Amino acid sequence: MPLLKILQESLKLLYREPKIFVPRLITTALYTAVIIYIAGITSQIAEATGYFQGDAASIDPAVVRALLGDLVIVLVSLLFLLLLDLISYAMYPALIREHSAGRPISLHGSLKEALGAWKILAVLGVMIILFALAGSIFILPFQFIALKTGEVSFYLFAAFIVMVAALVLLILLFFVIPVGVIEKKGVLDAFRHGFALSFRHKKDLFAINLFFLILSTVTFALMVLAETQYQGLAALSSIILFILVRVIQAVIYTYICVVNPYFYIQVR
């Protein structure tokens, strides 16, 4: 089936089966709560370090120490959300398989199948964390140079390199979860078979992952806009925009989750 047809059919599926939105809506709501919490902590840290007064040297150590507990809570929450994100993502292969076979979809049944692939999800979780750490370490010196020189191009160059690396990783891992959940494969077999399929369909996967990477970047930009632009008298506008962007985010991420197993079912 042509790639464009797969994208169109996946979009139609969202319309026919609104229940499919539930897992991503739940994770998006939880992420939103954590992001609001992080925003509050970030504001407190900025005040404690004198950032708003333009005096970053006037740091109150006592206040910063008091915020360390909050930072630990944020870190633990993000790790939990990553786990929840992977589980909800792994529900979609079972949902799409049942729909493609003409059977009614079951959120409970798909959750059980996703949990059954916990070893694969654990390996993917570790890989994501390591990639995030490596990407952050790689970007850090470029960000420091950009702050010192005022040349944003240094930071943009590093961010571009990380995005290219992320695109390659997304292509390689694209079929791993569908293989693990639908075919009931173990960790090694899921990765081996997933990699083989990725190489076989690398052109289509490059196009589809680039498309989704652009969508995700636009969504992230909208999210940042919603969180930073409106204050004071425009507080109501800020809340409306924030909620709207979160709904858009949930829809786009659900679409990504649907296309992934739908594509696999067409090419396996």
Segments the model singles out, each with a brief description of its role:
Residues 69-77, 105-132, 155-163:
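Alpha-helical membrane-spanning segments of integral membrane proteins, especially the hydrophobic core
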Residues 25, 29, 79, 95, ...:
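Residue-level signature of the transmembrane alpha-helical core
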Residues 69-101, 143-146, 150-188, 237-268:
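Selective recognition of hydrophobic, aromatic-rich stretches within alpha-helical transmembrane segments
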